[in-house]
């Protein structure tokens, strides 16, 4: 049960790392992202596809670039992460020692 959550968090972390690279270095291509992150090309490509489906990046002839929606998403991200952390904290089962 927890394994699936961990895998989702790892994948989200990768997607956000790819997004951060696009924001900082746009336009940027798959090969450069793969070389800098150590992620295989197919994983970078998948993250780019997910980010494109969310309208956070778009392809260009020079590589991935941000969209108008990217800034709004980034501004809301920290708040959403904090909400998730609070929810996870409330799920802990305390045991007596």
Question: Can you describe what each PLM-predicted range is?
Answer:
Residues 25-29:
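Short capping segments at the starts of secondary-structure elements
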Residues 32-35:
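A short acidic, leucine-rich amphipathic alpha-helix
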Residues 38-52:
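Short amphipathic alpha-helical interaction segments
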Residues 20-24:
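Short, locally clustered residues in the helix-turn-helix/winged-helix DNA-binding domain
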Residues 52-62:
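A short, conserved structural fragment
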Residues 62-80:
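Basic, amphipathic "hinge/linker" alpha-helix immediately C-terminal to the N-terminal HTH DNA-binding motif
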Residues 75-97:
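Amphipathic alpha-helical dimerization/coiled-coil segments
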Residues 1-18:
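Short alpha-helical segments that sit at the start of domains
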């Amino acid at each position: 049960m927890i394994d699936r959550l961990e895998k989702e968090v790892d994948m989200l972390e990768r997607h956000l790392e790819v997004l951060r690279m696009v924001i900082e270095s746009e336009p940027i291509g798959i090969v450069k992202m793969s070389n800098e992150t150590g992620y295989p090309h197919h994983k970078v490509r998948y993250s780019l596809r997910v980010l494109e489906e969310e309208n956070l990046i778009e392809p260009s002839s020079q590589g991935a670039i941000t969209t108008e929606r990217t800034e709004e998403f980034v501004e809301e991200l920290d708040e959403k992460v904090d909400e998730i952390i609070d929810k996870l904290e409330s799920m802990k089962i305390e045991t007596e020692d």
